[in-house]
UniProtKB/Swiss-Prot annotation:
Keywords: Cell membrane, Membrane, Transmembrane, Transmembrane helix, Transport. It comes from the Bacteria. This is Spermidine/putrescine transport system permease protein PotC homolog. It comes from Mycoplasma genitalium (strain ATCC 33530 / DSM 19775 / NCTC 10195 / G37) (Mycoplasmoides genitalium). Belongs to the binding-protein-dependent transport system permease family. CysTW subfamily.
Length: 284
């Protein structure tokens, strides 16, 4: 009886946690099925999902009418460049840390953790002061360069924390064996080290891109005239725009589809390994 009660509490806690995480996302998808007002704001009435107003324009039609393509493209360009710069820097830094003395290594990780714990507004102000005394002093304007530089500065620590633990677990005998087989250091990296690190690198790519894509606080202070999706969404003053809800629901569905595909791939991989083991056992 006591064990049953503990299991009930554990399952209830898990269910409550999942509900708190995913219920808001479900609400966004449901509300996106509502119509919109004459001002283009979403109608926050769940009754409209079942009985939509024929005179109310769909949120997805509003998405097609809105000029959000420029902010979206800007956000994607900034995110991709941030990933292409931040992740290689993190990989190189992780290898350098692996060969660093413990005292210096602890200091570097302390600085990394401090940068992650620093509030975004403090980071934004420090970057504005930096650009004011460097970039702007050469009569340059705030824009893509300042945004990308800022995003790289706060993205590298995230990528480093994700990649370094994987490098720590790398078996050095694999590297030595490849060298004994005549592999050059470059060939060893691309054939052994890089495939081994790919799961961590993939995670770092996702985290860095997502962090860059939805950043508002830092971007808003260094953006200049460049608009991103985050700054565009936060610029709303009266009501929630229907196109923003429609765009959010599309992102949610894409994320769910991506997670399902990754889960299916892992399942098929495990099944393939089991089939190979069974065949090897039968042949033996």
């Amino acid at each position: 009886m006591k064990k049953h009660f503990k299991n009930l509490i554990k399952n209830s806690y898990f269910f409550l946690l999942i509900t708190l995480i995913y219920l808001p996302l479900l609400i966004v998808v449901l509300v996106s099925l509502n119509g919109s007002s004459s001002r283009g704001n979403i109608v926050l009435d769940f009754g409209n999902v079942l009985n939509p107003n024929p005179d109310s324009k769909s949120a997805y039609l509003r998405l097609g009418e809105t000029d959000f393509a420029t902010p979206l493209i800007n956000s994607i360009i900034i995110g991709v460049i941030t990933v292409l710069v931040s992740v290689p820097i993190a990989v190189i830094s992780a290898f350098a840390l692996l060969r660093t003395r413990n005292a210096l290594k602890k200091t570097i990780f302390g600085i990394t953790n401090f940068s992650l714990a620093t509030p975004d507004i403090i980071t934004a102000i420090s970057l504005v002061l930096l650009f004011a005394n460097t970039w702007l002093s050469f009569n340059q304007q705030l824009g893509f360069f300042t945004i990308i530089t800022s995003h790289i500065s706060f993205s590298v620590p995230y990528a480093l924390i994700l990649i370094y633990p994987k490098i720590q677990k790398l078996n050095p005998n694999l590297i030595l064996a490849s060298q004994d087989l005549g592999y050059s250091p470059l060939k060893t990296f691309f054939h052994i080290t890089l495939p081994y690190l790919m799961p961590s690198i993939f995670s770092a790519v996702l985290v860095v891109f997502a962090t860059s894509f939805d950043d508002y606080v830092i971007t808003s202070l260094v953006q200049g005239s460049v608009k991103t999706i985050a700054t565009e969404l936060y610029s709303f003053r009266k009501g929630i725009k229907a196109w923003a809800i429609a765009f959010g629901s599309i992102l949610i569905l894409i994320s769910v589809l991506g997670v399902c595909l990754i889960t299916l791939q892992k399942y098929l991989r495990e099944k393939r390994k089991e089939i190979i083991k069974i065949r090897q056992w039968k042949n033996s």
